[in-house]
Amino acid sequence: MEYMAESTDRSPGHILCCECGVPISPNPANICVACLRSKVDISQGIPKQVSISFCKQCQRYFQPPGTWIQCALESRELLALCLKKIKAPLSKVRLVDAGFVWTEPHSKRLKVKLTIQKEVMNGAILQQVFVVDYVVQSQMCGDCHRVEAKDFWKAVIQVRQKTLHKKTFYYLEQLILKYGMHQNTLRIKEIHDGLDFYYSSKQHAQKMVEFLQCTVPCRYKASQRLISQDIHSNTYNYKSTFSVEIVPICKDNVVCLSPKLAQSLGNMNQICVCIRVTSAIHLIDPNTLQVADIDGSTFWSHPFNSLCHPKQLEEFIVMECSIVQDIKRAAGAGMISKKHTLGEVWVQKTSEMNTDKQYFCRTHLGHLLNPGDLVLGFDLANCNLNDEHVNKMNSDRVPDVVLIKKSYDRTKRQRRRNWKLKELARERENMDTDDERQYQDFLEDLEEDEAIRKNVNIYRDSAIPVESDTDDEGAPRISLAEMLEDLHISQDATGEEGASMLT
């Protein structure tokens, strides 16, 4: 006799919903999902509309209690900021998922879709999906408020240089732009003999002072003034001032060193030419091609002044030029420049062509000069030199003429210049009419000195076509390989192409 095996598969039982009578699978609440949702709202207590503050000037969002952060639209950082606004109500439920719902970037609305779970009647777990609407409200942050107020600052750096030329400031401006040291400034003010940098915190100003000490030879003094105080909480409000003084020497200046300093630099001659000012003063002896670098501390220990300013440059024409092959070096002499060639030249002033008066001198420009060339230099023989070191020198050791640089046609150089530099956004007052000429001198220095160009970002000017390399004068030029493309990349919190989120 055989017995039929009973099937072990059993269909799950069904019960009726206690509210609507619909057959459902058994659950701890004995109620269907539709009726459970109609009776219990697990999102109760979570606000469906929240406000969030946004600064239009700096494109940042406010994160309580006092922080402003920059977030792109629909980014993880912005989602975290939105969830923190409803952190307390969300702590009572379990957050399963969160994500943005697309909105128009200019609608001043952010929508976040949330999926939450919570245990309800008799241990039943209910899941619900809903949207929280964030209203973006305009609010100016503290930093932008200080910028607009123009007088609310905590620290100021006053950079000064006692010279008649601004070549060092133009070079310093390019270094600040290259390394982004201007980003924390509230405003930059240009005055006749320097620049003023305003900051919202003393730490940012100290960082800028350290940068200046690394890039140009200078010294500084710090002071502070008490603005207000609270005797109950023992807090004080100060305004700090940093006075930075750059050495009063610029490129192409003729200087006279003290005998002690000249001896310490390798027994070089006291009359030297400044060929470059970077983190140190670079000098060259036009009689021997001996070079030396003087840092800021050495300069302030043994100060010296410029004998002539750029407005005293005179134009000479080269009558004869010969290269000195055998350079005699004294005992203990310093390093000799390999980029220059020592030459002996006879020159005559272009303003004295109707006379037969000529001047003889040695120059470090022997590799550039040929008979008939024009050259700029200082006439020391007919100049009143009011310098304590020159007055003590033997007159035979003071040259009649010191040649500085070869002269080219400035109009042609400007016309063929297919590059440009960026400038700091700053306030200007009491501008000198000579500033444009000084700026053109700085641009010419960049073309002539490769060592300075390495520290400067040079951008190609697309408005000026690239000409051929044929040059009848042989004036120095900047190659295309040394230029950068001028790109404008906007950091926009909306994620759109250059558009502001709020108008």
Swiss-Prot record:
Annotated GO molecular function terms are: protein-macromolecule adaptor activity; ribosomal large subunit binding; RNA binding
- KW Membrane (keyword) present: no
**PTM annotation (Phosphoserine): residues:** 258, 468
GO biological process: one example: positive regulation of RNA biosynthetic process
Q: Which residues carry this modification: Phosphothreonine?
A: 433, 470
Renumbered ranges of motif Nuclear export signal: 480-489
Effect after changing residue 487 to A: Reduces nuclear export
Q: Please list where the region (Necessary for the nuclear export of the 60S ribosomal subunit) is annotated.
A: 425-503
Q: Where is this motif: Nuclear and nucleolar localization signal?
A: 405-422
As for subcellular location, the record says:
Cytoplasm; Nucleus
Which UniProt key words apply to this protein? Acetylation, Cytoplasm, Nucleus, Phosphoprotein, Protein transport, Transport
* Entry-annotated residues carrying N-acetylmethionine: 1
Where it mainly occurs, coarsely classed, is: cytoplasm
Q: Name one GO cellular component term.
A: membrane
Question: How does the record describe its quaternary structure?
Answer: Found in a 60S ribosomal subunit export complex with RAN and XPO1. Interacts with XPO1. Associates with pre-60S ribosomal particles.
Q: Which PANTHER family match?
A: 60S RIBOSOMAL EXPORT PROTEIN NMD3, NONSENSE-MEDIATED MRNA DECAY PROTEIN 3
What does the sequence similarity comment in the record state about its family?
A: Belongs to the NMD3 family.
What does it do?
Answer: Acts as an adapter for the XPO1/CRM1-mediated export of the 60S ribosomal subunit.
Q: What is this protein called?
A: 60S ribosomal export protein NMD3
Please give the organism: Homo sapiens
What lineage is on file? Eukaryota, Metazoa, Chordata, Craniata, Vertebrata
Record gene name? NMD3
